[in-house]
Amino acid sequence: MKKSKDGDELLMNKPIIKERQSAVVRAFAFVACILSLASFAHSLSAQEVAYPDEFATPIPLMGEILGDFHFPISSDSALAQNFFDQGIQMMYAFAKLESARSFREAQVADPNCAICFWGEAWSWGSYLNGAMTTADAPRALAALKKALALIDSANEKEADLIRSLESRYIDNYDPEKRRIQDQAYADTMAGLSRKYPNDLNIATLYADALFLLEERRGYRRLEDPNVIRLHGVLESVLARDITHPGACHLYVHATESTPTPELAAPCAQFLGTAIPGASHINHMPSHTWNEMGLWEEAVRANTIAWHSDQKAAIGRGVAIYPTHNLTMLYYAAAMGGASASSIQASKDLAKLNGNSAMHAMSLVRFGRYDEVLALDNEPNGDVNRSMYLFSQGY
C-alpha cells in the first residue's frame, strides 16, 4: 500500500522520535534516582543524628536559676557568652539535656562560635553517672565536626579543647569498648592541664576525664595511685577557688566512699547554692553530710533540692534525679529522727514513682504501726516488695 509523503516522513522519523522519547525517559529516571538518593541520604542522616523532642523548643536563659560561675569565651556576642555559661553550669549539675540545649542557643547567637559547638559535643559525652549512649554518640560527633570546621575562629586554648575531643568521639561508637577512647581523652586532658596550669576549668575537665576511668561505685583506697591523682587534681582547683561547682561536685563523689568524706565539707558548704535552681547541686552536699552523720544538714539540702524539682514545673528550677533527692531526704530525716520530713518525703516518692516501700519503712521507723497495716499499695520488684512485706509483718 502506497503511503503519502507526509506518512513516509512520519514513518521515517519514528526511530528518531522513539530515541528522543527514550532519552527523555532516561533523563527523568536519572533525576528521579538522584532525588531519591538525596532524600534517602537526608533521611539516613536524620536517623543517624536524631535529637530529643525538647530540641524543637529553644531553651531560655534561666536567670535566677543560675549562679555566678563564668567560663569566658572568645565570642563577641554577650548572648552567646551567657548561654555558654548556662550550658557549663547545667553540665556541672549533670543536667545534660539542658546543657546541650543551652549550647545550641549559644550557637544561634554566634554561628561562628567554635567553642559553642565544643560545649554541645562535650555535653553529649560520657559522664560520672553513665556512659555515652549509642543515641548520643552521633550527636556528639556531629557537634565536634562543626567545631572543627570553625576552629580558625577559636583562640589557641579553645582550639586545644576542641581537638581534645577528637580522641573521644569516633564513628561506630561501642559503649562496651569506650575505655580506649576514655583513656586517650584523659591523656590529652592531662597534657592540657600542664599547658594551662592556671585554668581551673581545664583542670576540672581533666578530673572529670580521670573519673571516667574509675568504677562509679565502691570503696576508694586513699593509697591507690589513681585516687591520689584524682584527689590531687581536684584539690588543686579547690585550693584556688573553693566555690568551683564542677570541682566540688566531683570532689564530693571522689571522697564519699573513702575513710575521709569530711575532706569535701569545706567546699560542700558552698556547693548547694552555687547553681541555686539546679536540684542536683542543691542535693549534692548531702552526700558528704550523710557520711559525716550531719542529718539536719542533709535534710536541709534535700528539702531545697525537692523544692527546685517542683519549681521546674513553672520554669524556676531544673529537676535532676528527683526520686534520688526524695530518697536521700527520707533517709536522712529517718536517721535524724525528723518524722514529719521522713514520712512526707516517702509519700511524695510513692506519688512520683509508685514505690510505697519507703513509705512503709518510714512508718515503721517512727512506730506508726496502724498506718502501716492500713497500706494497700504493694510495690513491684522483689526488693521493694520484701521491704513492704517486712513492714507489714513487723
PLM feature spans:
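Bacterial N-terminal signal peptides
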Residues: F28-S39
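N-terminal pre-domain segments of enzymes
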Residues: Q47-D76
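Amphipathic alpha-helical repeat scaffolds of TPR domains
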Residues: A78-D85, C113-W124, A154-Y173, N198-G218, ...
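Alpha-helical segment of the N-proximal tetratricopeptide repeat
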Residues: L79-S102, Y173, S391
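Residue at a conserved register position within TPR or TPR-like alpha-solenoid repeats
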Residues: M90, W124, S167, L210, ...
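Solenoid-like repeat scaffolds
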Residues: V108-A109, K195, L238-R240, F270-G277, ...
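Alpha-helical repeat scaffolds
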Residues: D136-A147, R179-A190, E223-S236, P261-T273, ...
